[in-house]
Amino acid sequence: MNQIDITASEEQKSERIDKFLASTENDWSRTQVQQWVKDGQVVVNGSAVKANYKIQPGDQVTVTVPEPEALDVLAEPMDLDIYYEDQDVLVVNKPRGMVVHPAPGHLTGTLVNGLMAHCTDLSGINGVMRPGIVHRIDKDTSGLLMVAKNDMAHESLVNQLVNKTVTRKYTAVVHGLISHDDGTIDAPIGRDKKDRQSMTVTRDGKNAVTHFHVLERFQDFTLVECQLETGRTHQIRVHMKYIGFPLAGDPKYGPRKTIDFNGQALHAGVLGFDHPRTGEYVEFEAPLPEDMAELIENLRKNG
């Protein structure tokens, strides 16, 4: 069993406990949370609660997460672009085209397979299919990920994500010309009822906030920096489509292919967090991958 501690904020006042926990960065489903509440594994301010409990600001919520079913993950030696590593955390620059963790039908060739060969220990809180994984980026998105090498680090990093103190900045190329230099997209994201493999903005979705800043404008495209306040599945891709500026090359949320680029033009370039052991803020920056830098240069040449 592993314990996760979460402090409720003012903006979460009066949310049901199951909705509150399902909206955190832990990728828990509401059904999963409801079962844990029923089993007495969710405690608020030291006492077990029922599923209809309404969150109050400052509530100290403790979730006891059961151990996952044991499954074997193959350790595969591979070249990893590691930016930082110590006894607690590892920061790796994931290439475009690599899946983060194994899943049914895709059990090898993932970042986790490579990490299992590189590290002797990784945290076990997220289960054996996702050891050490605190957050994810999509297969065709490149960039920085933080990995927990023990459960202490994992709990610290997850709590920082929940409390929105982790810096996550992405560089993206989007279709169209954004007229204003800065903006915030505050729109809940949930599973698309018509296509369960896609996400969409929906009233009953999870809270999602993205801030963006225009870096450069081209003839028919805009280069932007997007900063995540939350971390929903496909968040930047869904949010930019929602405001009318889908990512260039995005096969799922973009228009029909109008640009020569393999996958969405999105790179997780900046990652910052408080070190779990020392409390010191650390920040890392990964340059654009060659294919995305070339795309931007070509757009620049074309005006």
UniProtKB/Swiss-Prot annotation:
SMART domains: S4 (SM00363)
Keyword RNA-binding assigned: yes
GO molecular function: pseudouridine synthase activity; RNA binding; rRNA pseudouridine synthase activity
Reactions listed under catalytic activity: a uridine in RNA = a pseudouridine in RNA
Keyword annotations from UniProtKB, A to Z: Isomerase, RNA-binding
A Pfam family this chain is assigned to: PseudoU_synth_2
Enzyme class: isomerase
Record-linked CDD domains: PseudoU_synth_RluA_like (cd02869), S4 (cd00165)
Superkingdom to which the source organism belongs: Bacteria
Ranges for domain S4 RNA-binding: 15-74
Family matches, as PROSITE patterns: PSI_RLU, S4
Catalytic residues of the enzyme: 138
Metal-binding recorded as keyword: no
One GO BP annotation of this record: enzyme-directed rRNA pseudouridine synthesis
Enzyme Commission (EC) number: 5.4.99.-
Family of the protein in this entry: Belongs to the pseudouridine synthase RluA family.
Protein name, as recorded: Uncharacterized RNA pseudouridine synthase YlyB
UniProt organism field: Bacillus subtilis (strain 168)
Gene for this chain: ylyB
